[in-house]
Each structure stands twice: as structure tokens, then as C-alpha cells.
Amino acid sequence: MKEKILHVVSSACYRGTLKQAFYGMGIEDEVIYLPVDFSCNYIPKDFSDAELMLAVMSIGTDLLTLHDKEKILSELKTFVTTDYSSYDKVYVWHGGSANDLLLLYLMSILTDDNLYHIDITSCAKFMKKQNPWPYVDMGCVCPDDIKTFSMLSLAKKVMGTEKTEYIGQWNRWKASTKPYRFSSAETGIIEEYPADFMDDTIIKYAKEGRVLGALMAKVFQEYYNLFISTSIILKRIRELYREHKLDLTVSIRKK
């Protein structure tokens, strides 16, 4: 009988990458994604409805409609209550980003003896054109890379002390008191950051009269090695604006 295999990634975008690659490779395995980025949002202390709602609400109430909140909450509840023991193998795809690693730690809690992980970091040296650092995240992977670098062959079973360590890491980070958790592309180690850690950079570039897109691009370049997404930067810009710490009436570019 054919094995029942599930692949898990940390974002909808990465799910699309795997689905496209698998289509070309004739693979029909199921692929799911974690609907909340725990590197920059509240990590639930348990999987109760109240805690899961806190995670969803932390995404930013001004960025979500009521429909969005209900949809994400439903997806998150499904994610943490799925019977993963019904699969022969559960593959977690990850790189060195905090979001990827936190997914791996979470899946160590949710699975039994069927968890495997595919660490794409070993392919980093082949993807220098996309990322100059030792660690990469799933965002560096395109569909062709999955076949070219035989990434499925990188799968390793998570067991024993390794799984215990990952569970310990999840318990550690869910107790984090700071809002951001990012890992360095140079070390692959997660550290926590305060809410205002990039405020000075945002305000500095905003004062140059940059339009919003250019402002986000400059801030992104400053923190690229922490795998920070533009959505995180936009969220903080909006928070600063609401707190009257940032003037978003930026000037029109000069021709």
C-alpha cells in the first residue's frame, strides 16, 4: 500500500512552491501550511480557543477583517487538532528562519513517531546567488530547486533526544515576553527582540521623504539577514503611525 505522506511548511507561499514542484514530479502528497507566523505574533500557551484567538488577534486588528480572523482561527484550530498519527510520515520543510524553526518545534509537540524534517540549509552553498549567508529559509527555494537538489532525499527522522530538544524549544519560546523572535542567517540561532528594535531605522528613512514602498524596501535591506518579511515591517510602520511617532505624509518623488 502506498505510504500516506504529509508535507508541512510555514506559509501559504511555500505551500505553493511545493505543490508546483510536486506536480512536475508526479507527486500527489498532501501539503499544508501553518496559518500564523509565530516569529512575530503571539505564541499560544496551549491550544485552547482563547489562546488560539490571541494568536490570531496579534496579527493586527487593522490588517484583518472579521472574515479574515474567523478564517485564520478556523485554519489554526484545524492545524493543531489534526490527527497526524493517521499519516505514515509527516515531513516538515524548513530553513534557518525563526518561523521555519518554530514550525518544526510545534510539530514535535503535535506528532508521535512519524515526524521527519527536511532542512534545506545543506543546499545553501548551491544557492549563493539567492542568499550569501550559511543559512537560508524556504523563501529562497523555487520549485525547480526541489528536484535539482534532490531535497526529498534530505529527510531525516526526528526522534529521541532531538525530539525532546525541539519540544523544549517550543516550550521555551511560547514563554517569550518579547513580541519578535528572529534568527540570524549567519548563525541560525533564534533570539527575541523588543517591539521597538527597528523603530529608529524606520523613522530615519521615513524622514528622507520616501514613499511607503521605498521605505519598506530600505528597512528590509537593513534586516534582511534576520529573515524579516515586508509584512512584519508594514505592521510596525502602521503601529508607529497609530502611536503618532511616524509621519506617513511622505513627499512625492522628484522627477
Named regions from a protein language model:
Residues 23-26, 84, 104-114:
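Short, surface-exposed basic-aromatic patches at helix termini and helix-loop junctions that form
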Residues 61-104:
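Long, hydrophobic/aromatic-enriched structural stretches that serve as scaffold segments
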